[in-house]
Amino acid sequence: MSARESFNPESYELDKSFRLTRFTELKGTGCKVPQDVLQKLLESLQENHFQEDEQFLGAVMPRLGIGMDTCVIPLRHGGLSLVQTTDYIYPIVDDPYMMGRIACANVLSDLYAMGVTECDNMLMLLGVSNKMTDRERDKVMPLIIQGFKDAAEEAGTSVTGGQTVLNPWIVLGGVATTVCQPNEFIMPDNAVPGDVLVLTKPLGTQVAVAVHQWLDIPEKWNKIKLVVTQEDVELAYQEAMMNMARLNRTAAGLMHTFNAHAATDITGFGILGHAQNLAKQQRNEVSFVIHNLPVLAKMAAVSKACGNMFGLMHGTCPETSGGLLICLPREQAARFCAEIKSPKYGEGHQAWIIGIVEKGNRTARIIDKPRIIEVAPQVATQNVNPTPGATS
């Protein structure tokens, strides 16, 4: 997917001050309930999970615990399993078309974390803000829907239904469903000591979109202008937007090629939170140790200048439609990282070895002084495409 021209509201007969992100108070997957609260809220669901059919299901495969975003349900006939996920987010960027693509990629990412590359069907869930004018609704929502549809088509699937409601905030999400044979998905519970951890997208999207909004807020911009330029912020924002809209499908396919043992996608709990969730699911007594943090260029410096208010260096900064965190055999990891950059997969994208799996007690941590890998933006070298439907 090529880089895009900046969204211009006036091209759609909207006021030049229109901002999609003003129709929510939370951004992206930053809407997630805190992990500790979530665990308590869902305890009763975990206790009753498959209780009525435990004998049948338990004999087929281990169940996934709370904190993992995909359900795997063995079907009663044919040796097949239903793999399904649902997710929704709030607007995080101001380009409606790209926001639709990001929302779709975010839903699909949970399937990709299971190594599933084919999605049989998608539903779209939309909350249309009752604070929008009729013109804003009629101009903006079709762009969001088109972006969602285009991303689904890129994934080889289609949107066949869903639900649309009025809501104070804009809500964007969906359901992704597929039926798989056992060899078409990878249960996220087989990490072994000696594996390495690979990440397929850089961190820092939440920082990039936040500071991009600060360009219009002098009191906030003044806090960071000594460590970052306006051009740096614009590039980081564009890079974040392209990364969030990029499907994790290629990485999902390569998980099979290079014998991945477990994976999860990085979203609202940050890299540490999702690493901890994944560690809890492991059959073996292992722990994950993260040594390296690949971060969008200049966003680590911005985070530090803000007193680390984003939690980026601590691994708690939310990501939206982030990369896959994959446990790979040590001898396969470098080959995985080389292969995912190959032009055969389109533009090719980086992946990074960021840590190790060692014997432990099913926990995850980031070392005290992780190495920050500054990830230079690729958007500056890509072709620019206009937004669909814009008038000149």
Swiss-Prot record:
Q: What is this protein called?
A: Selenide, water dikinase 1
The primary gene name is: SEPHS1
Q: Where is the signal peptide?
A: none
List the subcellular locations: Cell membrane; Nucleus membrane
As cofactor, the record names:
Mg(2+)
Note how many cofactor molecules are bound and how: Binds 1 Mg(2+) ion per monomer.
Where in the chain is the site Important for catalytic activity?
A: 32
Which purpose does this protein serve, as stated in its record?
Synthesizes selenophosphate from selenide and ATP.
